[in-house]
């Protein structure tokens, strides 16, 4: 388990099981093998000396939780680098909230592709950029390039947050689903490239 909210969820499950007659001593051995859901506060470990976290977070509440987790794992003088966008056709009211949280709590932000549906993705990102007061976010439309840029920016002890897509292997476009390699694969590829360049 990693983030505090994962622990709270697990404790809720234990409480429900206990309330339904399962003894705590019977439940505990199963906790040793609990696996995190892909895309839910998923740590990417590929030999790098900085943290990479993939999470589905797309609401102000979930951003608050994942930024709290990032603050707990980032080195004392480390940076938090966030890559995210917002889905089209449904996230209008969430855009200011997620942008403001990132503006207040990140050290660098790259606004990038999400699920545009029938909206113009660049228009969504340009709107989101207007909510930033402290930071000047970069806009890199191509999500793979945005993740590459975040990895290039990261130093030892930093934390990269890849938010909004989780384990999705597609983008929702006007025409339907378009294949995407996933944030996990994009991050691992970017890390492998960065490590190879150091050799």
Residue ranges and their predicted role:
Residues 3, 12-199:
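ATP-dependent carboxylate-amine ligase
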């Amino acid at each position: 388990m990693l983030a505090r909210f994962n622990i709270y969820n697990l404790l809720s499950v234990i409480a429900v099981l206990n309330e339904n007659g399962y003894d705590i001593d019977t439940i505990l051995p199963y906790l040793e093998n609990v696996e995190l859901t892909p895309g839910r506060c998923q740590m990417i470990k590929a030999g790098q000396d900085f943290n990479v976290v993939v999470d589905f977070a797309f609401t102000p509440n979930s951003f608050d939780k994942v930024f709290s987790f990032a603050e707990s794992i980032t080195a004392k003088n480390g940076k938090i680098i966030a890559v995210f966008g917002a889905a089209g056709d449904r996230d209008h009211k969430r855009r200011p909230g997620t942008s403001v949280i990132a503006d207040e709590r990140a050290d660098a932000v790259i606004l990038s592709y999400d699920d545009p549906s029938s909206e113009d993705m660049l228009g969504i990102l340009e709107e989101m950029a207007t909510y930033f007061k402290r930071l000047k976010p970069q806009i890199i439309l191509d999500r793979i390039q945005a993740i590459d840029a975040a990895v290039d920016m990261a130093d030892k002890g930093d934390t990269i947050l890849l938010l909004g897509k989780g384990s999705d292997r597609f983008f929702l476009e006007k025409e339907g689903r378009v294949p995407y390699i996933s944030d996990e694969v994009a991050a691992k590829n970017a890390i492998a490239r960065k490590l190879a360049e150091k050799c």
